């Protein structure tokens, strides 16, 4: 917990905190220490993560992860990446709700770059509006290889996300 403790020791409460982890123990520690949002890039596959989110009533970011992938970076084949990712997110949302997660806890992220080719991520990025179907949309394009083929400035990438309905855009900004 060293990295978390360093951050928490210097946190002044000025903004909401989200933890990006697949590890239940780290997630629990973070939620016990002022973090409000659980972002699990595995799509909440790890044992105990769903139960923890239910117990803590934490907001969650459901990142798309192909159900047949053995790990989050395994490249999967899609016939229609937009429709398949949307359908898989809908199935996972229904599963989470059946396990006690409330709709109001859920935000969705199409998982750009996770288990997808650069072309798949490009297509998803160009069709972000499809993922605005009743849940806040979170987009993380920053530092992703596929953005190189879009030939857009960072401002244009960000504006596209907002214009497409994103509620939150995750960025990496160096100081």
Which residues does each PLM region occupy?
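Active-site-adjacent loop and "lid" segments of alpha/beta metabolic enzymes
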Residues: 1-17, 24, 31, 36-90, ...
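Active-site metal-binding loops of divalent metal-dependent hydrolases
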Residues: 112
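Phosphate/pyrophosphate-binding loops at sites that engage ATP/ADP/AMP, CoA/4′-phosphopantetheine
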Residues: 90-105
